[in-house]
A protein has these predicted regions:
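Aromatic-lined carbohydrate-binding/catalytic grooves of carbohydrate-active enzymes
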Residues: 1-123
Length: 123
């Protein structure tokens, strides 16, 4: 069973949600974390985003590890890669270099074949 809901969940709320699935004996195999796993506010994101929202997920690595260990869950993130990578993303410098762009230019890395290759290597 997959769970997906367009909602601004926090780390704590997702943990509680998973406990409720377990308490009510509802099977859950895959948890989809929707848009707000990354920043979506003006100036730091939009539909496309690559930097974890630290206000909602202060330690996302621990969350993902715990969901797997405690609940056996697979987690997938809702991605909208159409806008490529912008200069405010944490991974921008590495992605820019990987795509032959000088990071100092702050040029957007468009969503094209070379970017997709970088996406799978770096994200």
């Amino acid at each position: 069973y997959w769970w997906s809901r367009y909602w601004m969940y926090s780390d704590h709320e997702l943990r509680e949600l998973c406990k409720n699935f377990e308490n009510y004996n509802i099977p859950l195999d895959v948890l989809v974390i929707d848009m707000d796993w990354h920043y979506t506010d003006k100036g730091r994101g939009s539909w496309t985003g690559w930097t974890w929202n630290k206000e909602l997920f202060p330690d996302y690595r621990k969350l993902l590890k715990d969901l797997k260990a405690d609940n056996g869950l697979r987690v997938t993130l809702n991605l909208h890669p159409a806008e490529g990578v912008r200069s405010y993303e944490e991974q921008y410098e590495a992605v820019a270099r990987d795509n032959g762009v000088d990071p100092a230019t702050k040029q957007e890395i468009p969503s094209k074949k070379s970017f997709i290759k970088s996406m799978f290597r770096m994200f």
